[in-house]
Amino acid sequence: MNSLFASTARGLEELLKTELENLGAVECQVVQGGVHFKGDTRLVYQSLMWSRLASRIMLPLGECKVYSDLDLYLGVQAINWTEMFNPGATFAVHFSGLNDTIRNSQYGAMKVKDAIVDAFTRKNLPRPNVDRDAPDIRVNVWLHKETASIALDLSGDGLHLRGYRDRAGIAPIKETLAAAIVMRSGWQPGTPLLDPMCGSGTLLIEAAMLATDRAPGLHRGRWGFSGWAQHDEAIWQEVKAEAQTRARKGLAEYSSHFYGSDSDARVIQRARTNARLAGIGELITFEVKDVAQLTNPLPKEPYGTVLSNPPYGERLDSEPALIALHSLLGRIMKNQFGGWNLSLFSASPDLLSCLQLRADKQYKAKNGPLDCVQKNYHVAESTPDSKPAMVAEDYANRLRKNLKKFEKWARQEGIECYRLYDADLPEYNVAVDRYADWVVVQEYAPPKTIDAHKARQRLFDIIAATISVLGIAPNKLVLKTRERQKGKNQYQKLGEKGEFLEVTEYNAHLWVNLTDYLDTGLFLDHRIARRMLGQMSKGKDFLNLFSYTGSATVHAGLGGARSTTTVDMSRTYLEWAERNLRLNGLTGRAHRLIQADCLAWLREANEQFDLIFIDPPTFSNSKRMEDAFDVQRDHLALMKDLKRLLRAGGTIMFSNNKRGFRMDLDGLAKLGLKAQEITQKTLSQDFARNRQIHNCWLITAA
């Protein structure tokens, strides 16, 4: 009897144990990452040929204690390697694990290699050559603490390499994991199986091989026992011949069918090639089809299984499309596949909840480093009275109501950018802004007392409902998370896409960027203030301080300002402002852009302006500014400097976003200035619920 070890992906150990026992293995013992078992020589070959779940089959050769590199060398050399290798066999060493002595796996592999080679030269035998790419024998050494375990890898290449894969699509799953997913899906061979996001077809191919009794090792060309001196070629040929016979019989007798589709024509072509190479191409129908086009290919079949490994996102900007995808799949299952089963394998359990289905079973497994879950669902048969469940129904109803109200208003106003929803319902704490045919959803970060999983699920529901109510394509929705801003964080760069969208605001054309920054380049709540500036600017010299992307300057220029001066500390935003001005034909010497610390520039400037707009930050301690700035504390000093630049009869429009801001009217009077609050006049319909989003003042000479 041979003592053997079969490795597998985390979470599949018990499934592998059952498989090995069915092959005839005895004394099976599950450990993390695999199964120890015993069997005769025939079982060695059967496990290699027939295991769908094992990553590798190892033949343990011994263990040794490693307190020094010499211990490792002597421990390896103690094994009778000359009786292990066929003459002329090449070999390679795979070494994993470190300890205080062996701190580099390459060094460990070198010591093992030296010990094996020296075992031959000491007996005056030809030394075996190393072949890292295609060795006849693979030696595996695993070092854990002070113990090194040495084994022959009888698999050669990993057993997931069945020999049928042409080229993988994006983010494939290994064939061994795919087989486990099929086994756990609840699908019964002989019934229909469909994968609507099949990629290169791995799940369907593994299922078809299982259903037709086709051994997973049948198409492999190389094995790790080819240079093993104890290899029994006669038994191996018997095992191989039996597998070939069973495969022919299984294919001839199988009558059901498999269906796969994917939106990518290139991966569908690969899937067809893979299925043909696997010998089961005639059983699988592959189509280029988006999930939105999914229909039941066998509507008269009482039951079948939909099985898939849908995409998941690691980046925030991919989530809206994925949420929409899962929501859509859930609706299609209910409408088209009543009575069928659904099984999905995913690294994102939150996305699976968007199906709006209740799972009957779930399994955990690893896909490489990713923690994944497989959930099985039974889809109830629909009845004429069945009504689809609405996701986030209260939110959807409010958004629908707001859409009806604001869409017509915005069209009449001549604006393309407006707020559709502003945390109207406390439990749905987001802002939804429309930018032409795009939508930005800003999640206000939930307090730490709220369960993170529940908050994420609520956000997913919001996104699904937003896409549904507004009827937009998922890739037209941008998701952002907004936390309380500190200093310059409001200008934090989020991405590098550099994609700008042209929008209109009254008679102005403006560039917005929906993805690269937390803000888009256009503060929607200041829309009316910008229009007022345009109406006030004819024939005047206009100054815009803390100008951001210069949208107020554009309105002033279009309103007939004699000159405009735009000042901001950020080169990025000044370049953006220049693009906005150019887009509206506002170029030349009359339109200056100045990169400077606005407060420092203000103290030193000696020019005169008729109309000044200033929208400073609530607080700033930027390293590029000379002093920290607090708008409540410092606004009077700001007005003192502004007065010096204000031409007789001129006006300052002063705005800020500090909640509870109190204008120092007495202090202003001492400066010879007076203030008129116009906050309510600058709040449009879409910000009527948020009266404190900003405050705005007109300041003139007393």
Swiss-Prot record:
Gene3D superfamilies from the xrefs?
3.30.2130.30, RNA methyltransferase domain (HRMD) like (3.30.750.80), Vaccinia Virus protein VP39 (3.40.50.150)
Top-level lineage group: Bacteria
User: Care to name a GO molecular-function term for this sequence?
Assistant: 23S rRNA (guanine(2445)-N(2))-methyltransferase activity
- EC numbers, comma separated: 2.1.1.173, 2.1.1.264
Q: What class of enzyme is it?
A: transferase
Catalytic activity, as annotated: guanosine(2445) in 23S rRNA + S-adenosyl-L-methionine = N(2)-methylguanosine(2445) in 23S rRNA + S-adenosyl-L-homocysteine + H(+); guanosine(2069) in 23S rRNA + S-adenosyl-L-methionine = N(2)-methylguanosine(2069) in 23S rRNA + S-adenosyl-L-homocysteine + H(+)
The protein's name is: Ribosomal RNA large subunit methyltransferase K/L
- From the UniProt record, report the name of the gene that encodes this protein: rlmL
